[in-house]
């Protein structure tokens, strides 16, 4: 396996799926920058070195203790690795102000990781966040949103 692919495989399989938080020290640079794109909205880049990544993973696991990632596709080219992932877990702890629902969620992510000096130096994450909130019941499903939109358009209200 190519070194860049190996690092991302460790990120998914060891850090997330095996809950080995110490792996963050081995695979993340101290000055790693994360760019999040959630349902079309680009957030501010965030510093996420090894310690911040451990806290990030721990936070998700407190809310979704059975959380797992499955790599569906991975493409590596020079210092970049693009992955298509499926994240699955059961909502058992408060997450982003949403009380535990007991609902099982499954969402897709696309990630791009830039590797420098054998560590993750930068990443871009596209999360299907609308689907996530819909699965938790925090927002109406897409069909209901479209019905509401159509009714509003028909009545002239926006």
Q: Language-model segments: what does each one mean?
A:
Residues 1-158:
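C-terminal and inter-domain tail/linker signature
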